[in-house]
A protein has these predicted regions:
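C-terminal ends and interior cores of transmembrane alpha-helices
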Residues: 181-195
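Hydrophobic core of transmembrane alpha-helices in multi-pass small-molecule transporters
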Residues: 1-18, 22, 120, 200-215
């Protein structure tokens, strides 16, 4: 099972950056149009969470079967996407092109380097949420946690639709900083909330997902597209995804797993307050350093 899961991940994860590149290639104003397209993926996430939660499928193999079928349908649907030939079509292809090394030229820009490093570092504490929130809510006694977590995606829809307005009013740096602060805030809410009088803190922590995801991930993808331009758009998106959703998530999985294990209670369960304070602190440190060093560069037109 595990080798098959790894194989699936190797096939699927690159499509996250690829779909961004294809989308940006067909847009005249990505900062305005991309959120309207990306929000459909959020709706799909909500549907999946509601199905799993409402039908009580969380501890069964049914979600994996549903995912397998949906992946097959998605693969077939991809054949109907608009024709998007490589910008270097008909030109000699070098090893540098195949490996996407042109994206490394963006690192000459100090602000882009700061953005990439900050995004990579923030993705380490992010894994605490993705890997352990469901377990946390289960151990806290919240019923149907998978369904409750879709509240985060519901808030994501609203913030996704409003993202172009926020970008216009606040700019990339402020939006990214708000997104980073939201991650720290949600972990603090999880640390001190409970399923009794302070249950509102848990719900608020979940609802912050709209700010956490849209203001950090989606804004980062739009910023990367602006800095890269059409020629190295795909390479830049792939480079960002590799460092964040690849290396960052991998390190985050090991770090979060080790922290959660170290706070296991012998009688059963975990010391969640101390667990959540770890990623909260990490996010705050990244936020402060990013605020000092990040200076958005002028948009490129190449």
């Amino acid at each position: 099972f595990y080798p098959v899961l790894i194989g699936y991940g190797l096939c699927y994860m690159p499509t996250l950056a690829l779909t961004n590149s294809i989308s940006f290639d067909h847009m005249k104003d990505p900062s305005r149009e991309f959120p309207q397209i990306r929000v459909l993926g959020t709706i799909g996430w909500i549907v999946a969470g509601l199905i799993v939660g409402r039908l009580g499928l969380e501890v069964t193999a049914v979600p994996l079967r549903i995912a397998a079928g949906a992946s097959l349908v998605l693969g077939l649907f991809s054949l109907s996407l608009p024709h998007t030939p490589p910008h270097a079509a008909g030109k000699p292809l070098s090893a540098r092109d195949v490996l996407g090394l042109d994206a490394l030229s963006l690192l000459r820009d100090r602000s882009f380097t700061t953005f990439v490093v900050g995004s990579f570092l923030l993705c380490i504490p992010l894994q605490f949420y993705y890997a352990f929130t469901n377990l946390f809510l289960n151990e806290s006694g919240m019923g149907e946690p998978a369904s409750k977590m879709t509240l985060g995606q519901m808030s994501e829809i609203g913030f996704m639709v409003l993202l172009p307005w926020f970008l216009f009013r606040l700019g990339v740096k402020r939006i990214l900083l708000i997104g980073m602060a939201a991650w720290a805030g949600r972990y603090a809410l999880f640390a001190y909330g409970d399923t009794h009088d302070l249950i509102w803190m848990l719900y608020l922590g979940i609802l912050l997902h709209g700010v956490c995801y849209d203001f950090f991930f989606v804004t980062g993808q739009i910023y990367t597209d602006e800095q890269a331009g059409p020629r190295i758009r795909a390479a830049a998106q792939g480079f960002l995804a590799f460092l964040t959703q690849g290396v960052g998530y991998l390190i985050g999985a090991y770090v979060s797993g080790a922290i959660v294990k170290s706070y296991t209670i012998p009688a059963g369960g975990h010391d969640w307050r101390h667990i959540w304070l770890v990623p909260a602190t990490m996010a705050v440190v990244v936020l402060v350093v990013f605020a000092v060093l990040f200076r958005p560069a002028v948009k490129r037109e190449t």
